[in-house]
């Protein structure tokens, strides 16, 4: 069985936190899109904890350009030597409209087009 855990580290402490979680025996870490970018801490985890699997759980899709997101995911996948898994989601209407300033549309059909 593999054990993954949330990776809440601020960017300035991400390298050390990734090493600490690897030493504790975690197999992987995932970031959440809260008050920080979900990708940048994973770059540092990829570099400083080469045994950890990495994931976004989740990155909000619709405020991002699909091509830009694909580049970010591909670059992180290459940099981590295949240890990255992209998790994307739609988020709720209030967050999409108020936090990100993007029009909310029914997410299922839009996500299909996005992917």
Question: Predicted segment positions?
Answer:
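N-terminal beta1-alpha1-beta2 module of alpha/beta enzyme domains
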Residues: 1-56
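Residue-level detector of alpha-helix boundaries and kinks
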Residues: 27-30, 61, 103
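Short secondary-structure boundary segments
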Residues: 33, 58, 88-90
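Generic, well-ordered alpha-helical segments
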Residues: 33-37, 54, 61-68, 110
């Amino acid at each position: 069985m593999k054990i993954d855990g949330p990776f809440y580290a601020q960017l300035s402490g991400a390298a050390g936190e990734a090493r600490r979680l690897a030493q504790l025996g975690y197999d992987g870490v995932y970031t959440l899109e809260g008050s920080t970018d979900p990708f940048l801490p994973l770059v540092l985890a990829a570099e400083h904890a080469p045994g950890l699997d990495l994931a976004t759980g989740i990155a909000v899709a619709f405020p991002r350009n699909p091509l830009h997101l694909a580049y970010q995911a591909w670059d992180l996948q290459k940099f981590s030597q295949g240890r990255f898994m992209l998790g994307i989601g739609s988020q709720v209407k209030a967050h999409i409209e108020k936090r990100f300033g993007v029009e909310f549309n029914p997410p299922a059909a839009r996500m299909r087009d996005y992917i």
